[in-house]
């Protein structure tokens, strides 16, 4: 279960890639803008302010996130990204930090490029950090007792779950798009006693939390804290630097 409040604890940090992505979308007066994986809707609102004459719609598979987005006045729909089909007047498709959770997203991108009208835009960014120390720590603790039984069938994601910019550029160019693709590694400055754990609790650890009892979850937290502290040490000034690689693609259908 995705918790909108936990996710929004780092809203400023999580929002920066969205703005970097949006800055490269050249749509002028779109009719319909769809935010796939809209989450709590705080960034979907930004789309409405940029394109006030467009019909802006959110789409998310989490009932909690959809409820939070609707609470902000967003036209949010509940559904899996894999099931989404663009309506004929869709001009802009945004997927911010969502497609890495969709195994077949490469096929979806090609399909959308074929369904959207010429001139339409597909813009997405995906987390490219599944080989980062934070994810290695998540998997290492999951292999320990007493967590192995509950987490034995976890769908762990490897580094190749997302492609390099050049892969997406080739994929969407072959699908008939003009493509701008790049990657950025952000160094987030975090504060607090367990800032990286607090960050991943809102994203990468959501499925782990679902599978563990309250007691087991607290034991898991205590087990992963020293691993994260070693990988992301707190500086003498109380700051922790958390590196996070992201891959960006902006494609216009031709």
From Swiss-Prot:
Its EC number is 2.1.1.144. Its main location: cytoplasm. Gene3D superfamilies: S-adenosyl-L-methionine-dependent methyltransferases, Vaccinia Virus protein VP39. It holds the Pfam family Methyltransf_23. Signal peptide: none annotated. The keyword Transferase applies. It catalyses: trans-aconitate + S-adenosyl-L-methionine = (E)-3-(methoxycarbonyl)pent-2-enedioate + S-adenosyl-L-homocysteine. CDD domains: AdoMet_MTases (cd02440). Keywords: Cytoplasm, Methyltransferase, S-adenosyl-L-methionine, Transferase. One of its GO terms (cellular component) is cytoplasm. It comes from the Bacteria. One of its GO terms (molecular function) is trans-aconitate 2-methyltransferase activity. One of its GO terms (biological process) is methylation. Belongs to the methyltransferase superfamily. Tam family. Catalyzes the S-adenosylmethionine monomethyl esterification of trans-aconitate. This is Trans-aconitate 2-methyltransferase.
């Amino acid at each position: 279960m995705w918790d909108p409040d936990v996710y929004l604890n780092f809203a400023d940090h999580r929002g920066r890639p969205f703005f970097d992505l949006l800055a490269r979308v050249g749509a002028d007066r779109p009719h319909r803008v769809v935010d796939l994986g809209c989450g709590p809707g705080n960034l979907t609102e930004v789309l409405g302010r940029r394109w006030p004459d467009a019909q802006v719609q959110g789409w998310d598979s989490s009932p909690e996130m959809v409820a939070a987005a609707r609470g902000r006045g967003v036209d949010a729909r509940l559904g899996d990204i894999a099931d989404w089909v663009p309506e004929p007047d869709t001009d802009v498709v945004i997927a911010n930090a969502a497609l890495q959770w969709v195994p077949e997203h490469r096929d979806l991108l090609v399909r959308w490029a074929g369904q959207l009208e010429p001139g339409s835009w597909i813009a997405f960014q995906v987390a490219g950090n599944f080989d980062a120390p934070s994810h290695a720590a998540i998997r290492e603790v999951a292999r320990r007792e007493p967590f192995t039984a509950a987490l034995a069938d976890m769908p762990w994601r490897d580094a190749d779950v997302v492609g390099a910019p050049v892969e997406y550029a080739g994929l969407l160019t072959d699908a008939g798009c003009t493509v701008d693709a790049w990657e950025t590694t952000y160094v987030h400055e975090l504060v607090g006693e367990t800032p990286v754990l607090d960050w991943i609790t809102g994203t990468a650890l959501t499925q782990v939390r679902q599978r563990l009892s309250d007691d087991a979850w607290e034991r898991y937290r205590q087990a992963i804290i020293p691993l994260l502290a070693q990988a992301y040490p707190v500086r003498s000034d109380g700051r922790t630097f958390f590196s996070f690689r992201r891959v960006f693609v902006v494609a216009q259908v031709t």
